[in-house]
């Protein structure tokens, strides 16, 4: 009689875990609901490839600045600075833009074959520039002798290096319809001639290994060595007016006689004697002083005898050079 209630009670006690289990099931259901939420980042996985194209557009880190070896033999060559380089285009340029750039290159190639052999694209524009190539900034290339591209390259070589690296992806789009001969001109292959190699000649490098080549004049520090400097040098006008020289002092016979007498008395005149003599002869003190100096120099040159101090210094090896005194033309006798 008591067992059924116990069994019933036991069943009643076991019932509460049922809701717990149901709650657990509900919890499991909630976990099941949260499980679809966890893969919600999975739709972001298609967007994950977005950073992947960035390495294609983003240029590789620019190489450290290197010093191009160039020699005077290369600079003196008639074709110096006029080697052809594949034109550069920006990474964001569309296929139509690349095609337009290709058309511009074909026109320039036609102009080259017409006789402008020195016109060649050499430097690349910054990334914000259009996809058209720049012509060689050599003074023989441009009719006005200006070098806009050279100025940009000299101002910021690192920007031009980055633009050249960023242009690698868009070259294939813009140059797809061109033949190698039309694309690369006389070379007919995706290669560039490097000036200033170790052996002094030209070196062919494939397009994949193509470094950014700068002409030698970029490294010149004098503006006269650059193509942008004027080819004609203006001659400085010589001064037609001669510098006014003091007229030669003409001593009178009385003045010369008085000066010679003072010189016989003492070859070195004192300041007091010089002032009194200049006042007496109506001469400037500097004229009296210079006359005494010239008189001593003339006697020394005529006799060739050095004073005792000079001989003493020469014996010690401290005075071994001969001195010549420039005589003033004002000396008169």
Curated annotation (Swiss-Prot):
| Origin superkingdom | Eukaryota
Annotated region of DNA binding: 244-303
Cellular component GO terms held in the UniProt record: nucleus
Localization, UniProt:
Nucleus
Q: Where do Pro residues bias regions lie? A: 38-66
GO MF terms, alphabetically ordered: DNA-binding transcription factor activity, RNA polymerase II-specific; RNA polymerase II cis-regulatory region sequence-specific DNA binding
Region (Disordered) spans which residues? 1-184, 226-247
Q: Name one GO biological process term.
A: regulation of transcription by RNA polymerase II
Comp. bias intervals (Basic and acidic residues): 1-14
Function comment? Required for proper formation of the apical ectodermal ridge and correct dorsal-ventral patterning in the limb.
Protein name according to UniProt: Homeobox protein engrailed-1
To which species is this protein native? Gallus gallus
């Amino acid at each position: 009689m008591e067992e059924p209630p116990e069994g019933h009670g036991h069943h009643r006690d076991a019932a509460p875990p049922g809701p717990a289990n149901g709650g657990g099931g509900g919890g499991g259901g909630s976990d099941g609901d949260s499980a679809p939420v966890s893969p919600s980042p999975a739709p972001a996985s298609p967007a994950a490839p977005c950073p992947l194209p960035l390495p294609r557009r983003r240029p590789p880190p620019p190489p450290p600045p290197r010093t191009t070896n160039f020699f005077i033999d290369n600079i003196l060559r008639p074709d110096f600075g006029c080697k052809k380089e594949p034109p550069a285009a920006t990474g964001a340029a569309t296929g139509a833009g690349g095609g337009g750039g290709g058309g511009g290159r074909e026109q320039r190639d036609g102009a080259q074959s017409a006789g402008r052999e020195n016109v060649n694209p050499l430097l690349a524009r910054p990334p914000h520039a259009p996809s058209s190539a720049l012509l060689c900034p050599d003074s023989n290339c441009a009719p006005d002798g200006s070098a806009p591209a050279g100025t940009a390259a000299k101002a910021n070589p690192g920007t031009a290096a980055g633009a050249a690296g960023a242009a690698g992806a868009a070259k294939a789009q813009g140059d797809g319809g061109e033949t190698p001969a039309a694309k690369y001109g006389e070379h007919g292959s995706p290669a560039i001639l490097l000036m200033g190699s170790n052996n002094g000649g030209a070196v062919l490098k494939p397009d994949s290994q193509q470094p950014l080549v700068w002409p030698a004049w970029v490294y010149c520090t004098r503006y006269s060595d650059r193509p942008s400097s004027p080819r004609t040098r203006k001659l400085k006008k010589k001064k037609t007016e001669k510098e006014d020289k003091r007229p030669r002092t003409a001593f009178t016979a009385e003045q010369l006689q008085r000066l010679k007498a003072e010189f016989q008395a003492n070859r070195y005149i004192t300041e007091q004697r010089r002032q009194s003599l200049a006042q007496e002869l109506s001469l400037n003190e500097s004229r009296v002083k210079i006359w005494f100096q010239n008189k001593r120099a003339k006697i020394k040159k005529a006799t060739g005898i050095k004073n005792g101090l000079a001989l003493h210094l020469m014996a010690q090896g401290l005075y071994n050079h001969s001195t010549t005194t420039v005589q003033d033309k004002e000396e008169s006798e």
